[in-house]
Amino acid sequence: MNQITTQYVTENGACYEQYVITDPAAKTALTITPERGGMITGFTLDGEEYIWTRRPNFSECNRPRFGVPVLFPSCGNPDNGVHLFDGKAYPMECHGFADLCAWEVESVGPDGVSLVLESTPLTKFLYPFDFTLLVNYNLEGSKATISMTVINEGDKPMPFSFGYHPYFNASALENVDFRSPDRKSVV
């Protein structure tokens, strides 16, 4: 049976709450940091850390270059740093903005943590759509899973892409089995 605990990481005057899902039988732990882009910031197996966390980037306001950032509403570089929607230019960096936002905790259960990110006036300055993102992080034995649901809350088509940008510890990759099944669900 999994256990979920909270812990806090403090760096350069910033403090972030983390949720840690552990499976004592499998000797695994999955760490999620909602306020720092809603991302995974740790995965351990037999006490060995597989996710790279760079310091002091954890407490900096710029784009995270560690953990497993969530990429939304764009995974790549937009032309000239802008996306065009209905003929209007919207500024956006590579990988969108979801990894720069604080996410809200939707639910916490024995197998995982669910987070939500909703559109705000600031996100609409960059991306003119009403949306809700739901991400579920689960731990089953030695397997961590991520599932994402994107909801268009508006009445017009909402183009987007999403993905993840994992940073692995190079010395721990010999035991990593990374799979990304192609799944598509349109509602």
Please provide the spans of the model-predicted regions.
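Surface-exposed acidic/polar loop and edge beta-strand patches at domain peripheries
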Residues: 1-145, 149, 153-162, 166-187
